[in-house]
């Protein structure tokens, strides 16, 4: 069986590499034609795709998937509509491929510049979310990359149904149907092959639980664009407008629990804790959010708040649990975030411009937010059209990874017969 998986993955890799050579030189109009055809195919097959998703949901419930995974897995009509809107947004994005920048003459008379080009073949490994299949495929096509998609077994039927619509659109436009391939086996050996096929795959993008990301990071022989988890914070500073702070901290935690940009720790300045905490605690109680607090938080709110442990400060709950800590000021808040956070998304609520700038400069995260919810850390909200993932690394791409994150630059040299003396 291992040999057959290896052969299957080698075939997928070769097909992706061949397709990438065609996509590299595909015009913007041709790529947009393919994306428009995919949009039409998805619209025409919405009922079948949602039915396939229900099969996955039923299997998920039977297999007792936790609520966070089930939430990510589910495709409602509203989420399907959001997927289509994301695809529309990608179509109208400016195509970065072929863009030439920094063109300048050298004393020798040659011109030196940089041209933006596709990465080549992207390998994507993800869990649960079938909408990622379309987001990743659309961004790959628009940026001239082939992509190999390895979704979780729990979303296999949904992913296959979406992939059929994508293939149809590619065929209509005359682009290789293997530009986008979904791995149609649940054999875990497929992941091991995908992350080590350096001859076929140029970059790996894993999206999922911490154990998946750690495995890919440790075993991959290919560059990885990743974030381990989303332990996000909101710091309500002493000069915060509480009419802003209350809805921001409620939204950051309760808008959706099972996402990487949800707040997991609330930090409150000691100068306003006595006033702010009872109000926000009442709102969290209505949403049945369990609070785990520091001693000062428990003194203010009472013993109904569970004592927070050291582990709580590190934890991405992905559920209705929130750690709460009262801090002495901005320095302690920033130190806490940089020590316990995951460098994903962290926010401050304050009316003090100087402190807001200080927070922006000193918090070591891929997205830093002032007076808004952490839930905005998303490619769609950032105007990227969609995102293939979020990176907390500092090399190549950081934060939500959209079209430009799936490209690199090569040097171009333009001469008129010059030789080096």
Curated annotation (Swiss-Prot):
Gene3D superfamilies: Aldehyde Dehydrogenase, Chain A, domain 1, Aldehyde Dehydrogenase, Chain A, domain 2. Its EC number is 1.2.1.41. It comes from the Bacteria. It is found in: Cytoplasm. Keywords: Amino-acid biosynthesis, Cytoplasm, NADP, Oxidoreductase, Proline biosynthesis. It holds the Pfam family Aldedh. CDD domains: ALDH_F18-19_ProA-GPR. GO terms for cellular component: cytoplasm. InterPro entries: Ald_DH/histidinol_DH, Ald_DH_C, Ald_DH_N, Aldehyde_DH_dom, G-glutamylP_reductase_CS, Glu-5-SA_DH, GPR_dom. PROSITE patterns: PROA. GO terms for molecular function: glutamate-5-semialdehyde dehydrogenase activity; NADP binding. GO terms for biological process: L-proline biosynthetic process. Pathway: Amino-acid biosynthesis; L-proline biosynthesis; L-glutamate 5-semialdehyde from L-glutamate: step 2/2. It catalyses: L-glutamate 5-semialdehyde + phosphate + NADP(+) = L-glutamyl 5-phosphate + NADPH + H(+). Belongs to the gamma-glutamyl phosphate reductase family. NCBIfam families: PRK00197.1, proA. Catalyzes the NADPH-dependent reduction of L-glutamate 5-phosphate into L-glutamate 5-semialdehyde and phosphate. The product spontaneously undergoes cyclization to form 1-pyrroline-5-carboxylate. This is Gamma-glutamyl phosphate reductase. The lineage of its organism: Bacteria, Pseudomonadati, Pseudomonadota, Gammaproteobacteria, Moraxellales.
């Amino acid at each position: 069986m291992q040999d057959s998986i290896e052969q299957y993955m080698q075939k997928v890799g070769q097909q992706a590499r061949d397709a990438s050579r065609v996509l590299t030189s595909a015009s913007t109009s041709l790529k947009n034609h393919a994306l428009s055809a995919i949009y039409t195919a998805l619209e025409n097959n919405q009922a079948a795709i949602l039915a396939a998703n229900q099969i996955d949901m039923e299997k998920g419930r039977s297999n007792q998937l936790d609520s966070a995974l089930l939430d990510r897995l589910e495709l409602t009509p509203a989420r399907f509509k959001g997927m289509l809107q994301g695809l529309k947004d990608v179509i109208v994005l400016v195509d970065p491929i072929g863009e030439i920048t920094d063109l300048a003459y050298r004393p020798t008379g040659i011109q030196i510049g940089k041209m933006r080009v596709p990465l080549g073949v992207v390998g994507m490994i993800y869990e649960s979310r079938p909408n990622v299949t379309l987001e990743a495929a659309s961004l790959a096509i628009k940026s001239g990359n082939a992509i190999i998609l390895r979704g979780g077994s729990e979303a296999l039927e949904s992913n296959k149904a979406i992939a059929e619509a994508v293939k149809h659109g590619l065929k209509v436009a005359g682009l290789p149907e293997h530009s986008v391939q979904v791995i149609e086996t649940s054999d875990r050996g497929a992941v091991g092959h995908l992350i080590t096929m350096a001859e076929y795959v140029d970059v790996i993008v894993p999206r999922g639980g911490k154990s998946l990301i750690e495995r890919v990071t440790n075993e991959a022989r290919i560059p990885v664009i990743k974030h381990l988890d989303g332990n996000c914070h909101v710091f309500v500073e002493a000069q915060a407008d509480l009419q802003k702070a209350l809805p921001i901290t409620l939204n950051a935690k309760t808008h959706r629990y099972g996402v990487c940009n949800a707040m997991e720790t609330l930090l409150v300045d000691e100068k306003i804790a006595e006033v702010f905490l009872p109000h926000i605690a009442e709102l969290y109680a209505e949403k049945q959010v369990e609070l785990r607090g520091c001693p000062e938080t428990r003194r203010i709110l009472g013993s109904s708040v569970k004592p927070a442990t050291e582990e709580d400060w590190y934890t991405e709950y992905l559920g209705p649990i929130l750690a709460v800590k009262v801090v002495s000021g901005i320095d302690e808040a920033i130190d806490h975030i940089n020590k316990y956070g995951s460098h994903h998304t962290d926010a401050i609520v304050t009316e003090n411009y100087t402190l807001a700038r200080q927070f922006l400069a000193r918090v070591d995260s891929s997205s830093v937010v002032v007076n808004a919810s952490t839930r905005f850390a998303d490619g769609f909200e950032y105007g990227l059209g969609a995102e293939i993932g979020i990176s907390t690394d500092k090399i190549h791409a950081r934060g939500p990874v959209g079209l430009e994150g799936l490209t690199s630059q090569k040097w171009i040299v333009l001469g008129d017969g010059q030789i080096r003396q």
